[in-house]
Amino acid sequence: MTETKEEKVHKVFEKISPSYDRMNSVISFKLHVKWRKETMKLMRVQKGTNVLDVCCGTADWSIMMAEEIGPEGHVTGLDFSENMLKVGREKVTEADLHNVELIHGNAMELPFPDNSFDYVTIGFGLRNVPDYMQVLREMYRVLKPGGQLACIDTSQPNIPGWKQVFNAYFRYVMPVFGKFFAKSYKEYSWLQESTREFPGMARLAEMFQEAGFSYVRYISHSGGASATHFGFKKKEQ
């Protein structure tokens, strides 16, 4: 029986969870931290707000957002991998944060009422979901009017030379890193496949608009190795 994308991705993240944080730093040369910081600076996150971090994984972005909004705010992190959440909960406890809740759930059907959150974030997760548009629509639904979505993910450089280097790195080098650092060649081969199939920056911006978002914009990081897309839910008239 053919394995669905959702089943395959779930199996990948359940297996690589113990080494995920270390591999993230190895694969991106620790640039993922810089990309998040650049994104949050542009978001202008307000204190005391309510945040949803979709596909939160091991809670890196959940923790950064919790520190930014302060103790009066609240962050809910959601992921479908219990093993990733287990690592995330340990990190939240270690950081002594009391305004973060990590829950098991599916990004395709967010278990929240409409208009619940001031900010929704998703970092390196959208490319792994079965239906990009369904998840974009769900994130739009749970945003409050005036709320903001920020999505960081890998992208596809257009700079001649760098594009070829980037593609070769993801296709051939990254799985080898996975084999030697995490004993997971097969799983890291899947991650490069999901990166290769993910829409480019301009197309993803169009999808944001199709999902209902306004004032959509995006920035590229590190020559297009990744990109952040921003979108807002219009305030009710």
UniProtKB/Swiss-Prot annotation:
GO annotation (BP), single: methylation
Family: Belongs to the class I-like SAM-binding methyltransferase superfamily. MenG/UbiE family.
Summary of the function given for this chain in its UniProt record: Methyltransferase required for the conversion of demethylmenaquinol (DMKH2) to menaquinol (MKH2).
Gene name for this UniProt entry: menG
UniProt keyword list: Menaquinone biosynthesis, Methyltransferase, S-adenosyl-L-methionine, Transferase
Annotated organism of origin: Listeria monocytogenes serotype 4a (strain HCC23)
Pfam families: Ubie_methyltran (PF01209)
Protein name, UniProt field: Demethylmenaquinone methyltransferase
EC number assigned by the record: 2.1.1.163
Pathway: Quinol/quinone metabolism; menaquinone biosynthesis; menaquinol from 1,4-dihydroxy-2-naphthoate: step 2/2
Top-rank taxon, per record: Bacteria
InterPro entries: MenG_heptapren, SAM-dependent_MTases_sf, UbiE/COQ5_MeTrFase, UbiE/COQ5_MeTrFase_CS
UniProt: S-adenosyl-L-methionine binding residues: 58, 79, 106-107
Reaction(s) catalysed by this chain's protein: a 2-demethylmenaquinol + S-adenosyl-L-methionine = a menaquinol + S-adenosyl-L-homocysteine + H(+)
Molecular functions per Gene Ontology: demethylmenaquinone methyltransferase activity
